[in-house]
Amino acid sequence: MKNLIYLYLLSFTLISFGQENLSLNYYFSQQDITSLNKEIPSPESVIGHPVGKWHISHDKLVEYMRKLAFSSERITIEERGKTFEDRPLILLTITSEKNQKNINQIQKNHIDQTNGLLTPKTETPLVVYQGFSIHGNEPSGSNSALLLAYYLAASNDKFVNELLSNTVILFDPSFNPDGLQRFAYWANTNKNINLNQDSNDREYNEVWPGGR
């Protein structure tokens, strides 16, 4: 019985430790961390907590993306509209500084190639669209978007530099701002200090139909 009690208490300790150990070392290798530009703000320095400690709220997500765009020559940001609840729908364009300076020409070339007015060339950067968290109850996308955007903005790794030289990434950190905000509020106000996987827990039983 004593051994069972010990194992029970140890499991809570390990779960609690796992929640607290959410620094950049948890998400990135030491080599990745070494390559990061210290002039680019990390998510934690802006949102006030490590990524994963709390579900990101949409207002903090937007605040961080705007901070990245202000701090990095690789990123521009635009507001494309508003949601039903008047939250901004934002889109980041992430690419190399050189491509940013020629972004209008790159866009024109892609349109002309699509319309058959220009022969496709291998040196033309690819355009990739990445969107996160279409459903409010699928928050991992928008939470991971914090880390991915930071890495693309801050990394001086050779692979990342080559990627951004050859690619223009259209980056939508939240398809569904209203759903993300609703779920983040519910989960953050009802979660336990220690992780609880019991499906009967209040954290997992929202007052609206799940998913959206």
What are these regions (language model features)?
Residues 74-81, 158-163:
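Surface-exposed patches in mature extracellular/periplasmic domains of secreted proteins
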Residues 57, 86, 133, 171:
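Divalent metal-coordination and catalytic microenvironments
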Residues 34-53, 130:
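Acidic/histidine-rich, surface-exposed loop or edge segments in extracytoplasmic proteins
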Residues 107, 117-131, 139-212:
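Active-site/substrate-binding loop(s) of hydrolase catalytic cores
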